[in-house]
Amino acid sequence: MDSPIFSNDIDSIKNNTYQAKSYQKYNNSNNYNNNNNNSFNNYSNGSNYGGYNNSGNNSNYNNNNNLYNNNNINNNNNNNNNNNINNNNNNINNNNNINNNNSNNNNNNNNNNSNSNNSINSNSYKVNTPTQNGKSSHSPPLINANANVVFPTFKSLDLSSDTVNSVGAANNGSSNSSPTINGISNSNTMNNNNNNNNNNNNNSNSSNNNNNGNNNNNNNYNSFVNITKNNNNTNSNNYNNSTNSNNNGYNNNNNNNSISNSNSNSNSNSNSNSNSNSNSNSNSNSNSNSNSNSSSNSSSSSNNNNNNNNNNNNNNNSSSSSSNSNGNNNNNYHSYGYSNSKYNQQKSYNNAPHQLNSGGGQNSYYNKNNYNNGNGNIGNGNNSGSGNSSNSNGWSGGYQKQNGANRYQSQSQQQPQQQQQQQPQQPQQPQQQQQQQQQQQQQQQQQQQQQQQQQQQQQQQQQQQQQQQQQQQQPPQQQQQQQQDIGDSSRMNGGSRVPKAPGSDIGFNRGLNNSLNGQTDLNNSNYNSNSNNNNTNNNNTNNNLVNGKLQHYNYNNSSFKFNKNAQYNNGNNNGNNNNNNNNNNNNNNNNNNNSNNNSTNNNNINNSGNNNISNSVSSNSNGNVGSNPHRFQKNHFEKPFNSNSSTPSTPPNSTPSSSTTTSPSSSFNTYSNTFNNGSSNSFNNGSFNNSFNNGSSSNGSFNHGSFNNGSSISSFSGSFNNGSSGSGFNASFNGGSNSNSFNNGDNNNNNNNNNNNNHHNNDIDDSEPIIDQLDSTGEEEMDNLIGKLDLFSTKSESLFHTWKLNYSNRNNNNNNNSNNNNNNNNSSNNNSNSNNNNDNNNNDSFDGSNSDSQNIETDRTTTKVYITGKNFNNHNNNNNNNNNNNNHHYNNNNNNNNNNNNNNNNNNNNNNNNNNNNNNNNNNENNNGDVFSNGFSTWTPKSGSNSLNNSQNNLSNGQNSSNNSQNNLNNSQNSLNSSGNHHSNYHGHNNHHHYNNNNNNNNNNNNNNNNNNNNNNNGNGYVKSYYNNKYQQKSPQHQSSNSVVLIPPPGFSTIAPPPGFSTNNNNNNNNNNNNNNNKNNNSNNNNIIEVGKANYQTSTLNNSQDDSYQQEQEQQEQESQQQQQQQQQQQQQQQQQQQQQQQQQNYSSTPPNITPHLKGDGGLEKWFGNNIYSFGASQSLNNENTNPSYSYVPYNNNNNNNNNFNNINNDNNDNDIINNNHQQTNPSLQNDTPPIKMLSLEEIERW
């Protein structure tokens, strides 16, 4: 409050009251607010809410968020595309946030996150917050509070309660169950939404302000205040509108920016980064491009908006993007943003932070950016927040005045504390100046006040944290001293005022992250991630705020393992993502945090995701680290993974996130990160973050790299990124994304996805081999099946984890996508690159596949498992693949995107894709192939590392792009939003295509970027989808396909097409949406991947590339309907072949020009969604028991789903997941795709 910048406004805010406290944070937020992230975080202040937000958003994982996003999107739609974008970002990021963002969109966004409003929410919601448990998680109330969005869908998803609980708890915070994809997340999201809206508005205001830059800020603040009063909501809307409008233009951008949220958006931030990614180029590019990208980012730019804000910052944002490069800028901003007065120092600070930022830098920078924006990025800040991390931290920390930022660092020491601390320590609220922990505590206290329930939990946690704090507090004490110096500004920043500690820059982020991440933080982290992603937002706030609650939430996420977290991440991511995207872009920034994360996240993400895994975060540092982490991860997969985490190897659901959180989170986080990244990353990271993060140093190097890693990793998650990621991991698996998708996602990621995954994971019972289960259960209900389905025991553990990992990756992917961006960006080539990447990825994927195949070779069960894993990876991959295949196509899409968006965006997107690919590739490779195998067999970073790094960098760019994309995406999503479209996608393959097209169109309209984001999201979503499928299957859309979902080949979830293929296609579709890419996507989608033996073959459907393809598809769909009737008759005649004819009655003709591959006797064909799995019993089975060949034909539908996701992705992850679920057949694809038939035991055996 004291900070000069805000003081007046703040005063007014104070006067305004009630939010005042929040506002302080909020203000910070405000600053934040814009930051949102921070703000958000702080704001979240609402700790509660904020936390909530985080959690919500974050937690919400992306999925939720995403899903929410959809809502968001819708909201966005309402709000603006930008909002959407924000959403996207948010989506990714928070989705929630975004959503909120969305809602606010602009506000985004930013605020979204920030909003997250949360804070407000928190106020409003504090009650909800208590939902902390997760039971409440659904916290529909939150939703109610928002009253805007309804997430019934999620509810319909109805994740398993425990999952939910976990999530919830994690989420918890927020509604958090949000973590559950279900409503909770939604709720959170919703809340966020509202909040966001509110906040957003707030933020938005901020954002807008941001956009408007400071003025707005002031206004913002004012508005903000109003908002505050409004609770945001009004404001938000109000503001929102205003903002949007306001921004719009910028707003849009803003939104986007807001996104900047997007800055978040993605950071746009990311984008911002992304460009940034561009990285630096972004930097310059960043800025410039950054803007451009940014712009596209612009969206990001919109970021810009942030830009505006940024634009103020702008560029900052963009810068951010660039920033990434910006990083510094951000940092600068960061500092800059922080308080004007502080600026200079801050800048310096920044500089250090730059790296820092990188760590958080991005964020920071983002933050800065945002921050700068005054808020404005604030929102971004969010992102930055993600920058979060840094931002968030950075933010808080960073901004924290330089001191603060530095202060953060010590936090890094505190990470463990924060991890635990994030759960509310009860610092003196009054003294925000005190350590973040204290602040967090303060916030947490507020939250606690607001959320006694949470407090209880948190208190418990706090006790732990306090213990840790006691251990670590000394440094914090030092920090306190410094912080005191910082005084208000830190507070303003987000209150996380950790005193600067030596090395604080890094520490700062890290600390932040850590703290955010805190593993527990982890959750936080996640949150962070989210937070981070949100990170900033969240992070910071989240952190703090979150910490308390959110953290808690995260915490659960952690439990979620990453899934949840990841999602959360996504959420975070989303959160961040949101932020990242949101800035999540915030999201990321959320995504990353992403960015944040990304940045960190990226790190994270880049960490992957993979890194994410990598911890990447550290890695994120990517890349390398990432890779190492990746490897590390691998180890995780190996038992080490399990062992690594104290967490039982059991699926995350068992994961204790808390105590273990750190490590498991770590792993999870890692994942999460990824996921986070995913979403966020993706975009967050992507851009900026990444880039930034990666960005080289910033990124990586610094970023986290060390930093991240450094500590973080220690935190591993901690890594800030991880933190986010860590959480991220969580997130990732959390998942996200977006989702992530996570953040968590299960974002976002990616997030829900992750979440879902997590959930799923949670749901999954590794104890018994699936097959056994299947045998025993026979055609047991899908839910049950799926729960178990996941994996076969032995491997399942590792696999499971792996799966999660992959999941993360998925998030990652998102991130990756972002990364791709990079890569692509790395070339803009993108396309080329992408393609190359894709190819590589594909190759990698294939390689991975090979690995996978090898795994497959080991035994069917294994095979299945692996495949599943792969799929998951693919999922992740999906993103990756998406990226991969997608990349290929996706790239194309990207290309399209590029075309549409800008090339930049597209590039970014492409890059993202590629990046993802890279990541994925690497990841994929790692994740995909690698992941697949990677996930399983080698987690070696393989190219993943480098790629990952690249990816990461790219990712950052990607993120930027992504952000942009996200922005675009949001826009697209708005279009998409049109869930109708979305649904349409569901509804028909063609539709889907169309949908994509819509997307495309939207993308086109919005930018392909959006699509890209979608893609990114897709990745997240995809996985998620799987998870959700289980739940989703219930959803009406999926009803027909329930069984389908139910039955992927064992070990395959619907999601689990051969690795990523389906996903790829999905992505492709997304891409597809994107334009030609659509075609490509279609092609990709069409591509038939055969998994068998070591290699996958992909073929393009003839029609996939034709524009007429869709028409053909439509015709085919019609035909397929007829065929279905015929087939139904025939099938009835063929009962002998299939016991489950009824289930297949709906089985429609294969997608156009695609023929299922049935091989040999017993060959089973299944549509998962439109995907066809062919199992050639005789062919591969006979030939090699171990290598049944799977012909997976990812059909566009998946892509569609992705799109859907994307859409949903906004929905994203949730929906994504759901959509994936859709994939499940894209329920709407029913015509095209019959429900999957259940395998009979016999078949299974044969199979």
UniProtKB/Swiss-Prot annotation:
Biased composition (Low complexity): 26-125, 169-178, 185-223, 230-341, 363-375, 385-394, 409-431, 472-484, 523-544, 553-628, 655-667, 738-759, 807-855, 871-928, 943-983, 996-1021, 1064-1087, 1110-1122
GO biological-process terms attached to the record: positive regulation of transcription by RNA polymerase II
Biased composition (Basic residues): 984-995
Protein name: Uncharacterized protein DDB_G0283357
GO molecular function, one term: transcription coactivator activity
Polar residues compositional bias, start-end: 126-139, 342-356, 511-522, 929-942, 1026-1044, 1099-1108
InterPro entries: NELF-A_domain
PANTHER family in the cross-refs: NEGATIVE ELONGATION FACTOR A (PTHR13328:SF4), NEGATIVE ELONGATION FACTOR A NELF-A (PTHR13328)
Organism, scientific name: Dictyostelium discoideum
Region annotated Disordered, chain positions: 25-141, 169-431, 472-667, 738-770, 807-857, 869-1087, 1099-1122, 1139-1162
A GO term from the CC aspect: mediator complex
Pro residues compositional bias, start-end: 1047-1060
